C-alpha cells in the first residue's frame, strides 16, 4: 500500500484553461454561517500543521521546510475510513482530532465541506485539490470504502496492474502531473511489485498578489543563512503600505500579504536568535487573530524570490505524532479489503513553491499609494523566516514552510 501526497504553490497570472476534470468544483455558501463542522475541524488542522512542522524543524535546522498540512491530513483522514481498531484511532488522534469532543462522522463531514470550499470556482485565484485511488485489478475492495471516499472526499478510482510496475508508476505520475499542471513530475520514483493499492492526494494553488512588486525594483542582496554563511538572492523590494507589525509575543515581524481571491500569505521574520521561540509559539488562535486584525503601516519591504521543494517520507515524522500502526504488520486495513492483510508501506509527500513579483496580467499596470512622511521601518527578510498560506473562507493552513536558504534546491 502506497500513500502519496503532493502540492504545488505558484504565484503569477492564471492559466487560461480551468483545472480540467480531475478536480470537482462545487458552489459553496460562506462557511462561517453554513459549515459548522468545517469550523470544528479547522483548529485541529492548524495544530496538526504546527506539530508536523515542529517535528520537521527538530530533525534539521539547516534545511528549508515546505509542505501542505491540508494535503497530508486529507489523505490520512481518507485512509482512516478503511482502517479499524488501534490503526483507526491512531490516525485520527495523530491528526489532532479528539473523538470525545468531535464525533468521527463530523470529522469526515468537515473534510467534505473543506474540499468543497477549496474547489469552489474563483475567477481570481486558482485552487484545486484531487484524491486518486489506484487499485490493483485483482483486489476486491469493500464497497462501503469506495462509496465513502467518493462521497466524502470526492475521490476518483482507477484500476491498475501493479505487477507492471513501470506502467503503474506512469499512470500515477501522469495523474499527478495533470493535476498540478506539470509542476510536480515523477512523484513516485519506485514502486514495489507487491503494491496493491495507492492513494494520491494533490493540491494546486496559483494566485496573483493583490499588490504586486515591480520587477525592475528587484535587486541581488545578501541573505544570511547563519552567522558563517551568506548567499546572494534576488530580493523583491517595495516601499508602501503593508499589513505589518512587530509582535512582542512571537518576537517577530509579522507581514500579511493578500492574494486576489480568498488567500493570504503570512510571513514571520524572527528577531535575532528567536527563530525557535517563534516556532514553539505558533498556534491556531494566534493565526486567527492576525487574520482578523488589520495593522496597516508604511514599510520598506525586502522579500526574496523563492523556488523551493519539500519531499518527505512521512513514515518517520508521523511516527513521532503517534501514527505507527498503519505502517506495521499489525495494521488493520480490513475496511479497504478483506482479501489479505494490508499495511501502508510508504507515504510520500512532495510540495513545490514559487514566489516572485508576478501578480498581474495587465501590461503597464501601476499602483500608487500615499505614504506617511515619517521614516518607515526597513523590514528585510534576509535571514531564516517562517511563512503560512491560508485560505480565507476556511482559515485552513494550505501550506507552511521555513526558508533557511533560498538557494537550496
Curated annotation (Swiss-Prot):
It is found in: Secreted. Pfam families: Serpin. The keyword Signal applies. Its main location: secreted. Keywords: Acute phase, Glycoprotein, Phosphoprotein, Protease inhibitor, Secreted, Serine protease inhibitor, Signal. GO terms for cellular component: extracellular space. Residues 18-39 are annotated as: Disordered. Residues 364-383 are annotated as: RCL. The record marks 373-374 as: Reactive bond. Glycans are attached at residues 61, 98, 136, 262. Coiled coil: none annotated. GO terms for biological process: acute-phase response. Residues 1-15 form the signal peptide. Plasma. GO terms for molecular function: serine-type endopeptidase inhibitor activity. The modification Phosphoserine is found at residue 374. Inhibitor of serine proteases. Its primary target is elastase, but it also has a moderate affinity for plasmin and thrombin. Inhibits trypsin, chymotrypsin and plasminogen activator. The reactive center loop (RCL) extends out from the body of the protein and directs binding to the target protease. The protease cleaves the serpin at the reactive site within the RCL, establishing a covalent linkage between the carboxyl group of the serpin reactive site and the serine hydroxyl of the protease. The resulting inactive serpin-protease complex is highly stable. PANTHER family: ALPHA-1-ANTITRYPSIN, SERINE PROTEASE INHIBITOR, SERPIN. Interacts with CELA2A. Interacts with ERGIC3 and LMAN1/ERGIC53. Interacts with PRSS1/Trypsin. Belongs to the serpin family. This is Alpha-1-antitrypsin.
Amino acid at each position: 500500500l502506497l500513500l502519496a501526497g503532493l502540492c504545488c504553490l505558484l504565484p503569477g497570472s492564471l492559466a487560461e484553461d480551468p483545472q480540467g476534470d480531475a478536480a470537482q468544483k462545487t458552489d459553496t455558501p460562506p462557511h462561517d454561517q453554513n459549515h459548522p463542522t468545517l469550523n470544528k475541524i479547522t483548529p485541529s488542522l492548524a495544530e496538526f500543521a504546527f506539530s508536523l512542522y515542529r517535528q520537521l524543524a527538530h530533525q534539521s535546522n539547516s534545511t528549508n521546510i515546505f509542505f501542505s498540512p491540508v494535503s497530508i491530513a486529507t489523505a490520512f483522514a481518507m485512509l482512516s475510513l478503511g482502517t479499524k481498531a488501534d490503526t483507526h484511532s491512531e490516525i485520527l488522534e495523530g491528526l489532532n482530532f479528539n473523538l470525545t469532543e468531535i464525533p468521527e462522522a463530523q470529522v469526515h463531514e468537515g473534510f467534505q465541506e473543506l474540499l468543497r470550499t477549496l474547489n469552489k470556482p474563483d475567477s481570481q485565484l486558482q485552487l484545486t485539490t484531487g484524491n486518486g485511488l489506484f487499485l490493483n485489478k485483482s483486489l476486491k475492495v469493500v464497497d462501503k470504502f469506495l462509496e465513502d471516499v467518493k462521497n466524502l472526499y470526492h475521490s476518483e478510482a482507477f484500476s491498475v496492474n501493479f505487477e507492471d510496475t513501470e506502467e503503474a508508476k506512469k499512470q500515477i505520475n501522469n495523474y499527478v502531473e495533470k493535476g498540478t499542471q506539470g509542476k510536480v513530475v515523477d512523484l513516485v520514483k519506485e514502486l514495489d511489485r507487491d503494491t496493491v493499492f495507492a492513494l494520491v492526494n494533490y493540491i494546486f494553488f496559483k494566485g496573483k498578489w493583490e499588490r504586486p512588486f515591480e520587477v525592475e525594483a528587484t535587486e541581488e542582496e545578501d541573505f544570511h543563512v547563519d552567522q558563517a554563511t551568506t548567499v546572494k538572492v534576488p530580493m523583491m523590494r517595495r516601499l508602501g503600505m503593508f499589513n505589518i507589525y512587530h509582535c512582542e509575543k512571537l518576537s517577530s515581524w509579522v507581514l500579511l500579504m493578500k492574494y486576489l481571491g480568498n488567500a493570504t500569505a503570512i510571513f514571520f521574520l524572527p528577531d535575532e536568535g528567536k527563530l525557535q521561540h517563534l516556532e514553539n509559539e505558533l498556534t491556531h488562535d494566534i493565526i486567527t487573530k492576525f487574520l482578523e486584525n488589520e495593522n496597516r503601516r508604511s514599510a520598506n519591504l525586502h522579500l526574496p524570490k523563492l523556488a523551493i521543494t519539500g519531499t518527505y517520507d512521512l513514515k518517520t515524522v508521523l511516527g513521532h505524532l503517534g501514527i505507527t500502526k498503519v505502517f506495521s504488520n499489525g495494521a488493520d486495513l480490513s475496511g479497504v479489503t478483506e482479501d489479505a492483510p494490508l499495511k501502508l508501506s510508504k507515504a510520500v509527500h512532495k510540495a513545490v513553491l514559487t514566489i516572485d513579483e508576478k501578480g498581474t496580467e495587465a501590461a503597464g499596470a501601476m499602483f500608487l499609494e500615499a505614504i506617511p512622511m515619517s521614516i518607515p521601518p526597513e523590514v528585510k527578510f534576509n535571514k531564516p523566516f517562517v511563512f503560512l498560506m491560508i485560505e480565507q473562507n476556511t482559515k485552513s493552513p494550505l501550506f507552511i514552510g521555513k526558508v533557511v536558504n533560498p538557494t537550496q534546491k
